Amino acid sequence: MTRTFVIAGIVAVCLATHGSAQSDKQGVLYRSPGGTTLRLLLDEGNVGPEVSMAEMTFPPNSDTPEHAHGAIEMFYVVSGELEHVVNGKSEILKPGMAGYVKPPDKVRHKTGAAGAKVVAVWVPGAEARKIAARWTREP
């Protein structure tokens, strides 16, 4: 529950201090080789470099490779279930639940038959663009 309030608080502060409109760079969809999609919602184009936010959809029965980020990554599950594995410790996140990972920890995401949709937040915010740069931009 505390993690949910942390995510909501970060986003609320950024929106209150920088405005809430999307920049023309947002809303673009990116797809990973495994089929996960990322749609940028907020980034340096409107909130500055402090934070970025995206909607991510993990396809059914997906399993991302273990990886690390250069920023704090927080997830809020909107639908489905996401197995959030940090340094080998697994937690099942269901709708309404949140999880996070800090650098240099290793993270892996797995889904079941329903897949999962999450809102992801990165602090500092440049991390979302780094992820998107490695994925394919959808038309």
Walk through the language-model features, giving the residues of each.
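Ligand-binding loop in jelly-roll beta-barrel domains
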Residues: 48, 103-128
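Bacterial N-terminal signal peptides that target proteins for export
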Residues: 1-7
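Conserved short histidine dyad/triad with adjacent acidic residue
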Residues: 52-69
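Glycine- and acidic-residue-biased ligand/ion/polar-headgroup-sensing regions
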Residues: 70-82, 87
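Histidine-centered active-site/metal-ligand motif
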Residues: 67-69, 84, 107-109
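Short acidic-glycine-tyrosine-enriched beta hairpin
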Residues: 88-104
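A short, N-terminal "cap"/entry segment at the start of jelly-roll beta-barrel domains
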Residues: 5, 13-50, 130-139
